[in-house]
A protein has these predicted regions:
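Bacterial N-terminal signal peptides
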Residues: 11-23, 27
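Non-catalytic, surface beta->alpha helical segment in thiol-disulfide oxidoreductase systems
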Residues: 140-141, 147-174
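Conserved redox-active cysteine motifs that mediate thiol-disulfide chemistry
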Residues: 57-75, 100
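Short pre-active-site segment immediately N-terminal to redox-active cysteine/selenocysteine motifs
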Residues: 51-53, 57-61, 98, 141
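Short, internal strand/loop/helix patches
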Residues: 107-142, 146-147
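Conserved helix-turn-beta segment immediately C-terminal to the redox Cys motif
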Residues: 50-53, 69-95
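N-terminal "domain-start" segment that seeds a small globular fold
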Residues: 23-48, 67, 122
Length: 174
């Protein structure tokens, strides 16, 4: 009986370790993708391993996505720390809906607004590009943000105000 109890404890510990490993892999695994933005410029995630990179997976019809997008946090961070700032940060907007199109991103009927005007960072979505990128991530709904660190690890992070959000970037393991 004594050994059966010890074996049971060991099996429980192994099972728990395996479950936690699967959760960690789903939440924080490295994603590698190449996609064209709506201007047909190609982006390869492997070119951004030297900086923190935010991937915002949203949908053109999503109200909470629109509220986050128009809140200005990503634009401010991109301006201050992106390619035209300190160049230590990159942002990608991904319209994960397979029906995404240039006209929908420009605010056509069926979209909650014009995603293009005032957006300085790449918008990936039309022609299935956004859905293809989104398929590399495990997420439960829109909007979802992933922060790639220099190591390629991309944990899901919360939407927040600029400096709290920047703290996540600073804590990003490089």
């Amino acid at each position: 009986m004594k050994y059966e109890n010890e074996i049971f404890k060991i099996l429980c510990a192994i099972s728990l370790t395996m479950i936690l490993s699967l959760i960690f892999i789903n939440k924080c695994s490295a994603q590698s993708w190449t996609a064209n933005d709506m201007n047909n410029v190609s982006y390869d995630m492997s070119n951004y391993t030297n900086k923190a990179t935010l991937v915002d997976i949203s949908a053109h019809w999503c109200g909470p996505c629109w509220a986050w997008h128009t809140g200005g946090v990503m634009e401010e961070l991109y301006h201050d720390f992106g390619p035209d700032g300190t160049d230590e940060f990159m942002v990608f907007f991904i319209d994960g809906d397979a029906a995404s199109s240039v006209s929908l991103l420009n605010g056509a009927s069926g979209s909650v607004g014009n995603w293009v005007t005032g957006t300085p960072y790449p918008l990936i979505g039309p022609n299935g590009e956004g859905a293809s990128v989104a398929s590399n991530y495990t997420f439960g709904g829109y909007p979802t943000l992933f922060l790639h660190c220099g190591t390629g690890i991309a944990p899901e992070i919360q939407r927040n105000e600029k400096w709290v959000f920047w703290n996540d970037v600073l804590n990003c393991s490089q």
